[in-house]
Amino acid sequence: MSLLDPRQFLLPAFYLDPSTQAFLTQAVSNHKLGTASSFRISDILEPSPNNSTYSHDLDPSPQSVRSDLSTSPRASSPDRNSPMSKKSRKARTIFTDKQLQELENTFEKQKYLSVQDRMDLAHRMGLSDTQVKTWYQNRRTKWKRQATSGMDLLSEPGNLSAVQNLIRSSPYWANYITALPMGGQMGQMPMMGLPMPMIVPPAQHFQATSSSNSPSTHKSSESPQLDVSSNSD
């Protein structure tokens, strides 16, 4: 005579015989019954490992995306070390002393060359037209810069020492002042748009002497006025 299980009298609706319980337990372990091993609320709400793995496969994390991008080769970006990526630089022309002297002499006479003159000069010197054109452009830029610095110095009234230094250091201004009419004297010299009255003697007579302020100098400067007045009488 077998013993009776008291649970069959207490909960007849939920009572299962031992063979049925064994079958259900084996089915749960084999098929996971919807991937949940128990019917507790916490176990039901907890995501299953299979679902989490599937979600990771569909939605990779940003960190994994960044790592894939960093490790993947960039086929579109060119190699910086390759010779094709480097810009080709033109070789700088090295002029001989004779060529430079002839270019300087031509520039002193003519600051701007026509196309025909430039071609003739290039042919005569054994250079290309582009080389002569480039040299003239650079030389004009230097010439304009020197002229601008000279204008800035001359715009200061009474700056005689600066003018002397400028003439000694710049051949352009020495030739410019020497070539002025009336013995190199300027009555009204416009500098930077403003008239600046000053008298500049020729470059070869630019010497700071102590006798410039002597009484004899004033007498010599006043003597033409005395002669003019005597002739008028």
Swiss-Prot record:
Keywords of this entry: Developmental protein, Differentiation, DNA-binding, Homeobox, Nucleus, Sexual differentiation, Transcription, Transcription regulation
Domain of life, source organism: Eukaryota
GO cellular component: nucleus
InterPro entries associated with the record: HD, HD_metazoa, Homeobox_CS, Homeobox_TF, Homeodomain-like_sf, HTH_motif
Annotated segments matching region Disordered: 50-93, 206-233
Molecular function terms from GO: DNA-binding transcription factor activity, RNA polymerase II-specific; RNA polymerase II transcription regulatory region sequence-specific DNA binding
Principal subcellular localization: nucleus
CDD domains (UniProt xref): homeodomain
GO BP terms, alphabetized: cell differentiation; negative regulation of apoptotic process; nervous system development; regulation of transcription by RNA polymerase II; sex differentiation
Entry's localization field: Nucleus
DNA-binding region ranges: 88-147
PANTHER family for this protein: HOMEO BOX HB9 LIKE A-RELATED (PTHR24333), VENT HOMEOBOX (PTHR24333:SF5)
Role according to the record: Cell-type specific anti-apoptotic transcription factor required for the sexually dimorphic survival of the male-specific CEM (cephalic male) sensory neurons during sex determination. In hermaphrodites, the homologous cells undergo programmed cell death due to transcriptional repression of ceh-30 by tra-1, the terminal regulator in the sex determination pathway.
UniProt name for this protein: Homeobox protein ceh-30
